């Protein structure tokens, strides 16, 4: 972090600006908006600043800059056209340990100005630490388009209601949960539509009826890449009091969890320690009964070999309210990143997902169905049984020459895709790090041509990177 982001209270504080031209005027406009008492040292002022001086909105010191000018001010901005003067201002300010900014000269600044999105009292600052000001400006423009102007009104109304909410809801957790609900509900919609009176009535109603019970949200984290987490999933993990996560949730996803939320690992791996499912179920119920907002965060999609159905049955049995946020399952995400289409008009008219890890008393797999040609077979948690899988498929008619792949660490920077055939599937799986996904079918043969991501991305049709910069800052921009 090159610069520490901080918001300064300038209301009523003296600020010195050296320079009387258009550059100085732009900074002075911001300072006046913040309530600063602006002193301008310059021999001449442009028309805009002259008008401000005539209206007594700024104090004009029509003289040469002197060291005495900086001694009684809070911060200093050098914005003259004289580079030598600007640098002298910097040196004197530094010697007095006063914050100083020389406009457009980063080496002579103890602080810099960010790009600002103003939804007063909500303010958002964007900075590239002076490295790429145009990029920071483009980001600001993108955020300006995304953020409704009603945010400021929403914040002002909320400020008026803070004391009432605090009196009604005693704990910080209760108050946070209440406001999260309002900012994502009907109150926010009313404010956006300029219906202020109705919005305040809605707040009063919600405060009176505020539900204090717990809640569980079953959230699919996707296959690993944090960029594949859904927007709804992100909202849920940033509103959680506690997150129960498994071993397939990547560090990138966990870094998005609200910082003060409790995180509890409840994962399991085929070769390692495991948290019994019954313990996880009981923990969800207990935490919800304590009135906490719980997120059960599961790799991939919670309803695709994630035992999500079993967990919801437990919650329903104990009358715990819940919701489900789907995620991108590994079979979809990992194969896409490996350049292996699950279906293709020339090679596969169907795709079948199956688990390689079954309950001990589960009925036998229908191998005849899985061995059909012109379909893609994706096997979760099958690496340890790869030899048996290959043997059974061949026994039921699948050719030993059928292309096969083992994808490890799918969608993550460490992703590896090992390809071969059904005949040597066991060898491919033996050296593959977990978590690994097995893909069998003619579509695997397209990997070499379509691979685009990571160290395997050497296909002849590779077109750049996973994400064009910022998704294309300009509408319609695509990878070249």
UniProtKB/Swiss-Prot annotation:
Biochemical pathway: Cofactor biosynthesis; adenosylcobalamin biosynthesis; precorrin-2 from uroporphyrinogen III: step 1/1; Cofactor biosynthesis; adenosylcobalamin biosynthesis; sirohydrochlorin from precorrin-2: step 1/1; Porphyrin-containing compound metabolism; siroheme biosynthesis; precorrin-2 from uroporphyrinogen III: step 1/1; Porphyrin-containing compound metabolism; siroheme biosynthesis; siroheme from sirohydrochlorin: step 1/1
Known catalytic reactions: uroporphyrinogen III + 2 S-adenosyl-L-methionine = precorrin-2 + 2 S-adenosyl-L-homocysteine + H(+); precorrin-2 + NAD(+) = sirohydrochlorin + NADH + 2 H(+); siroheme + 2 H(+) = sirohydrochlorin + Fe(2+)
EC number: 2.1.1.107, 1.3.1.76, 4.99.1.4
SUPFAM superfamilies xrefs: NAD(P)-binding Rossmann-fold domains, Siroheme synthase middle domains-like, Tetrapyrrole methylase
List of catalytic residues: 246, 268
Gene Ontology molecular functions: NAD binding; precorrin-2 dehydrogenase activity; sirohydrochlorin ferrochelatase activity; uroporphyrin-III C-methyltransferase activity
Annotated residues for binding of NAD(+): 22-23, 43-44
Binding residues annotated for S-adenosyl-L-methionine, in chain numbering: 223, 299-301, 304, 329-330, 381, 410
Any single biological process term in GO: siroheme biosynthetic process
Span list, region Uroporphyrinogen-III C-methyltransferase: 214-480
Ranges for region Precorrin-2 dehydrogenase /sirohydrochlorin ferrochelatase: 1-203
Organism superkingdom: Bacteria
Keywords: Cobalamin biosynthesis, Lyase, Methyltransferase, Multifunctional enzyme, NAD, Oxidoreductase, Phosphoprotein, Porphyrin biosynthesis, S-adenosyl-L-methionine, Transferase
Record bears the keyword NADP: no
Family annotation (InterPro entries): 4pyrrol_Mease, 4pyrrol_Methylase_sf, 4pyrrole_Mease_sub1, 4pyrrole_Mease_sub2, CobA/CysG_C, NAD(P)-bd_dom_sf, Siro_Cobalamin_biosynth, Sirohaem_synt_dimer_dom_sf
Residues that bear Phosphoserine: 128
Family annotation (PANTHER family): SIROHEME SYNTHASE, SIROHEME SYNTHASE-RELATED
Family per record: In the N-terminal section; belongs to the precorrin-2 dehydrogenase / sirohydrochlorin ferrochelatase family. In the C-terminal section; belongs to the precorrin methyltransferase family.
Function: Then it catalyzes the NAD-dependent ring dehydrogenation of precorrin-2 to yield sirohydrochlorin. Finally, it catalyzes the ferrochelation of sirohydrochlorin to yield siroheme.
Protein's recorded name: Siroheme synthase
């Amino acid at each position: 972090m090159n610069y520490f982001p901080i918001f300064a209270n300038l209301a009523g504080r003296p600020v010195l600006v050296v320079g009387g031209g258009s550059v100085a005027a732009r900074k002075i406009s911001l300072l006046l908006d913040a309530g600063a008492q602006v002193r301008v040292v310059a021999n001449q002022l442009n028309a805009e600043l002259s008008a401000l001086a005539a209206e007594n909105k700024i104090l004009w010191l029509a003289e040469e800059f002197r060291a005495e000018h900086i001694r009684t001010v809070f911060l200093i901005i050098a914005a003259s056209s004289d580079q030598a003067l600007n640098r002298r201002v910097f040196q004197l300010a530094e010697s007095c340990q006063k914050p100083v900014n020389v406009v457009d000269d980063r080496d002579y600044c103890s602080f810099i100005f960010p790009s600002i999105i103003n939804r007063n009292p909500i303010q958002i600052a964007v900075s590239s630490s002076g490295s790429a000001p145009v990029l920071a400006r483009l980001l600001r423009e993108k955020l300006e388009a995304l953020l409704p102007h009603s945010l400021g009104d929403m914040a002002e109304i909320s400020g008026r209601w803070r004391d009432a909410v605090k009196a009604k809801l005693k704990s910080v957790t209760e108050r946070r949960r209440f406001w999260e609900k309002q900012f994502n509900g009907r109150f926010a919609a009313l404010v956006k539509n300029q219906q202020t009176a109705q919005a305040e009535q809605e707040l009063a109603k919600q405060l009176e009826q505020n539900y204090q019970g717990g809640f569980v949200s079953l959230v699919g984290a996707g296959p690993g890449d944090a960029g594949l987490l859904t927007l709804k999933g992100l909202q849920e993990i940033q509103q959680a009091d506690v997150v129960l996560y498994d071993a397939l949730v990547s560090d990138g996803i966990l870094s998005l969890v609200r910082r003060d939320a409790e995180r509890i690992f409840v994962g399991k791996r085929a070769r390692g320690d495991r948290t019994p499912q019954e313990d996880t179920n009981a923990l969800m119920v207990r935490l919800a009964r304590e009135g906490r907002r719980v997120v059960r965060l599961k790799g991939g999609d919670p309803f695709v070999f994630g035992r999500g159905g079993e967990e919801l049955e437990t919650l329903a049995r104990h009358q715990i309210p819940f919701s489900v946020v789907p995620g991108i399952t590994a079979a979809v995400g990992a194969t896409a990143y490996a350049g292996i289409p699950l279906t293709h008009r020339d090679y596969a008219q169907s795709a079948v997902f199956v688990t390689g890890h079954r309950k001990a008393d589960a009925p036998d797999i229908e191998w005849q169905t899985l061995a059909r040609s012109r379909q893609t077979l994706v096997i979760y948690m099958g690496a340890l049984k790869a030899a048996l899988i290959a043997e059974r498929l061949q026994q039921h008619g699948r050719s030993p020459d059928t292309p096969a792949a083992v994808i490890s660490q799918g969608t993550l920077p460490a992703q590896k895709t090992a390809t071969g055939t059904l005949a040597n599937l066991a060898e491919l799986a033996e050296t593959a790090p977990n978590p690994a996904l097995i893909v069998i079918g003619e579509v695997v043969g397209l990997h070499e041509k379509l691979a685009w991501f990571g160290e395997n991305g050497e296909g002849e049709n590779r077109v750049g990177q996973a994400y064009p910069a910022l998704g294309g800052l300009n509408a319609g921009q695509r990878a070249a």
